[in-house]
């Protein structure tokens, strides 16, 4: 596992965007051989999306031959609802880059058959072989996507009940009213995420400190689903200083020295 210890959340966004752009450019994607990118929603990746848009506008990366798969979607709110994850992605990223509409893959939270929708999504991912890079965030309780504590570490895309903690955290997007936050969502599984060639998780803020500690220094544990990253051959965690407060000093020092060349300029 790589840990990229930075100082501020804005640096996390810029580092992650530069990393994604480099991966895409090194891959040299074509229509027949697209780069497959997994994407999250929420507050944490906003800085990354902003930086990626800037790189695109500067001509430093193109998304014309990039296929995307999003992590999750709420059940029970319209696709055009301002807080649906479809709306989030178009408003904060897709509308500002050259991605082709047919290359955007999103879960449908309004289908009548959730099981069939989840199978369709897994099959679509498999049709591309694999996801080359999956970016994600992490919840205060260590969940990745909507894989809440006690989720199976081999789980696939499925319907999940959201914990009260998650709904409280997400209520900030619903005028602070938890009753407006959906109780269920469709989400990729931990196993789906681990199938990706590379996984990059962004961690910012002191509220995520215990989750980062569990991911880096703890044991692999289904109560902290982010800890499953320890099983991945190519996992990267990009974090700011407030999120590092529960890590041992020697842990931060070790990774700071190891990644010194890679964090210069950020």
UniProtKB/Swiss-Prot annotation:
GO terms for molecular function: glucosamine-6-phosphate deaminase activity; identical protein binding. The record marks 151, 158, 160-161, 254 as: Part of the allosteric site. The keyword Hydrolase applies. Pathway: Amino-sugar metabolism; N-acetylneuraminate degradation; D-fructose 6-phosphate from N-acetylneuraminate: step 5/5. Pfam families: Glucosamine_iso. Its EC number is 3.5.99.6. InterPro entries: Glc/Gal-6P_isomerase, Glucosamine6P_isomerase, Glucosamine6P_isomerase_CS, NagB/RpiA_transferase-like. Belongs to the glucosamine/galactosamine-6-phosphate isomerase family. NagB subfamily. Catalyzes the reversible isomerization-deamination of glucosamine 6-phosphate (GlcN6P) to form fructose 6-phosphate (Fru6P) and ammonium ion. This is Glucosamine-6-phosphate deaminase. The gene is nagB.
């Amino acid at each position: 596992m790589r840990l990229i210890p930075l100082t501020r959340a804005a640096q996390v966004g810029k580092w992650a965007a530069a990393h994604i752009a480099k991966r895409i450019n090194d891959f040299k994607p074509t229509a027949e051989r697209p780069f497959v990118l997994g994407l999250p929603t929420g507050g944490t990746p906003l800085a990354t999306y902003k930086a990626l848009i800037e790189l695109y506008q500067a001509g430093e990366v193109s998304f014309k031959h990039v296929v995307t798969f999003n992590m999750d979607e709420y059940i029970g709110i319209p696709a055009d609802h301002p807080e649906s994850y479809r709306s989030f992605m178009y408003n904060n990223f897709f509308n500002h880059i050259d991605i082709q509409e047919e290359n955007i893959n999103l879960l449908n939270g309004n289908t009548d058959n959730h099981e069939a929708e989840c199978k369709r999504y897994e099959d679509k991912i498999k049709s591309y072989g694999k996801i080359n890079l999956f970016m994600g965030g992490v919840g205060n309780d260590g969940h990745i996507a909507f894989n809440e504590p006690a989720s199976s570490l081999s789980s696939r895309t499925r319907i999940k009940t959201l914990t009260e903690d998650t709904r409280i955290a997400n209520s900030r997007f619903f005028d602070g009213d938890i009753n407006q936050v959906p109780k269920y969502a469709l989400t990729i599984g931990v196993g789906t995420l681990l199938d990706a060639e590379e996984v990059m998780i962004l961690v910012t803020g002191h509220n995520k400190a215990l989750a980062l500690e569990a991911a880096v220094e703890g044991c692999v544990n289904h109560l902290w689903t982010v800890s499953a990253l320890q099983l991945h051959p190519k996992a990267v965690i990009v974090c700011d200083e407030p999120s590092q407060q529960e890590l041992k000093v020697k842990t931060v020092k070790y990774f700071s020295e190891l990644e010194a060349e890679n964090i210069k300029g950020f």
